[in-house]
Amino acid sequence: MTEQNLTIQKNKYDKTGECIQTGLGAEQLFDQIAESKSLEIKNAKRRENIHKHIDKYVTDETGTWSVDIKARKKTSRSNSQAQDDWIWIEFQNVRGNTGWLYGDADRIAFETQDNFTIVEKDSLIKYVENVVDMGKSVKYSSQAQYKTYRRAGRNDLLTMVELSEIKKNCKHFVWEK
């Protein structure tokens, strides 16, 4: 991706460009793994990426499916390293629009240090809606485990859910790195 495209895609809240760089790196790694499995992979159109939360289309023996790829994340901006235990789930994005959980992707691919855990989105929605206390909003990101959280000055609505619980309760498969 060119520097010009990077600037176009960078969110105004991503002041350093770190978020877009991390996300693009995860997408490139996902592509490499898919290609190593001899799968056909196609980039979503920019509009699909932004409005439908679809990054890629993958064709395998089951057919073609869409995926939204999520890079490893820190639980808090103050953390120095990304971690693999807790997954940030987005109900609403920073503009207050539909978050990626309710986007049009068939699957969500969560990057970890060792793999991508690829989860059926419908089963993820069902699980998250069942375990997150939507009536309990917290002020700090460190308290967002199974509770809703909004960042100051933004319209997003987020929560954190344990990846191990997602794997226990949602349809998924794993691609090793």
Model-derived segments and their meaning:
Residues M1-E48, K73, S80:
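Acidic-basic catalytic patches of nuclease active cores, encompassing PD-(D/E)XK
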Residues L6, K15-E18, Q113-K177:
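Non-catalytic C-terminal interaction segments of nucleic acid-processing enzymes
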Residues Q9-G17, N43-A44, A71-D122:
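Catalytic cores of nucleic-acid endonucleases
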Residues A34, K56-R77:
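Conserved catalytic cores of phosphodiester-cleaving nucleases, focusing on short active-site segments
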Residues S36-A44, V67, S76-G96, F116, ...:
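Generic preference for hydrophobic/aromatic residues in regular secondary structure cores
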Residues R46-Y57:
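Beta-rich nucleic-acid/ligand-interaction surfaces
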Residues H51-H53, T62-S66, D84, Y102-A105:
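Short connector loops at helix/strand junctions that flank enzyme active sites
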